[in-house]
């Protein structure tokens, strides 16, 4: 462990510097409610298709059912993920991850770091992959995944995703038991910034949300997303899919949907997710997959017998 314990904001800056040197583009948090960094278009959309891609970004992640009124030391309505996606996956990705921990002052020789097999899936978004939870000193701090399917579509090129739970990483580094005792930066505590919002969002999610309004909004967001997809407007449509997903999560936290209804709502979100993923690939194919520079791969996907040639030629919809 380094002598000076990194503040929360310095952890972010350190990870940004590390992954930028590994070829990741430093993106900003997506400006829509999401439950995980995976749901940002910088991961969800870009993981499909054959184009190479690298991104790293902080993503505030809202999970209404996990709210605990600011009273639980490590369970939150909103937490922060540091998301890294590299496509195609580097062969030494696990070693790079361990190097990133070392950059944070977490020495593998001084800490108990374990990769625990945990094949990951997000059923509502049609995502799945093989992977591991990474436990540091007895608590899960990172999810490590090789994507196999995104939006219900088998990927062309395997994307490696590393999702750091920033609050948990920070409690290891700063050696505190409660996230609210973390130093965010410049002497300001995490609790000074986020404890009151945690209480208010929890009260809203569990007690005060308007169920009738949320049910209406889900249907309207869903219809808007489908209408936009029919017009080929992928990115606005995806925004409304994210709104639909978050609205469902609010309904679920409020106990407003039965077990049977829950499965139905998840199916509706998954249907939209599959359609937007497919439409995004078609959009990129028609543009000629501009980020794909490897000629052999261009031939494989866009050549005479290429996988996406019919889409480009307008023979497939």
Swiss-Prot record:
Keyword check for Translocase: no
Record-linked PROSITE patterns: AA_TRNA_LIGASE_II_GLYAB
Keywords: Aminoacyl-tRNA synthetase, ATP-binding, Cytoplasm, Ligase, Nucleotide-binding, Protein biosynthesis
Catalysed reactions listed for this entry: tRNA(Gly) + glycine + ATP = glycyl-tRNA(Gly) + AMP + diphosphate
Entry EC no(s): 6.1.1.14
An example Gene Ontology molecular-function term: glycine-tRNA ligase activity
Location(s), subcellular: Cytoplasm
Class of this enzyme: ligase
Statement: the UniProt record of this protein carries the keyword Iron-sulfur: no
A GO CC annotation given for this chain: cytosol
Cystine bridges: none
SUPFAM superfamilies in the cross-refs: Class II aaRS and biotin synthetases
Assembly notes: Tetramer of two alpha and two beta subunits.
NCBIfam families: glyQ, PRK09348.1
UniProt name for this protein: Glycine--tRNA ligase alpha subunit
Gene designation per UniProt: glyQ
């Amino acid at each position: 462990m380094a002598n000076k314990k990194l503040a929360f904001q310095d952890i972010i800056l350190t990870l940004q510097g590390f992954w930028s040197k590994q070829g990741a583009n430093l993106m900003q948090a997506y400006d829509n409610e999401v439950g995980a960094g995976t749901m940002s278009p910088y991961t969800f959309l870009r993981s499909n298709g054959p184009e190479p891609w690298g991104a790293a970004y902080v993503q505030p992640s809202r999970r209404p059912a996990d709210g605990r009124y600011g009273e639980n030391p490590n369970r939150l309505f909103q937490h922060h993920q540091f998301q890294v996606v590299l496509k195609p996956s580097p062969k030494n990705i696990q070693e790079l991850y361990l190097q990133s921990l070392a950059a944070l002052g977490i020495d593998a020789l001084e800490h108990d770091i374990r990769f625990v097999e945990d094949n990951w899936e997000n059923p509502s978004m049609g995502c799945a992959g093989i992977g591991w939870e990474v436990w540091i000193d007895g608590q899960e701090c990172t999810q490590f995944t090789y994507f196999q399917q995104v939006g219900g579509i088998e990927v062309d090129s395997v994307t490696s995703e590393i999702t750091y739970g920033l609050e948990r990483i920070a409690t290891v580094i700063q050696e505190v038991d409660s996230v609210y005792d973390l130093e965010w930066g410049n002497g300001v505590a995490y609790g000074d910034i986020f404890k009151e919002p945690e209480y208010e969002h929890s009260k809203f999610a569990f007690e005060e949300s308007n169920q009738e309004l949320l049910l209406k909004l889900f249907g309207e967001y869903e219809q808007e997303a489908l209408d936009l997809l029919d017009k080929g407007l992928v990115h606005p449509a995806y925004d409304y899919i994210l709104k639909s997903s978050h609205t469902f999560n609010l309904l679920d936290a409020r106990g407003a949907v039965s077990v049977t209804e829950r499965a139905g709502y998840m199916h509706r979100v998954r249907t939209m997710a599959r359609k937007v993923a497919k439409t995004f690939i078609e959009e990129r194919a028609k543009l000629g997959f501009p980020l794909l520079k490897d000629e052999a791969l261009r031939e494989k996907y866009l050549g005479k017998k290429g996988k996406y040639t019919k889409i480009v030629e307008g023979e497939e919809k």
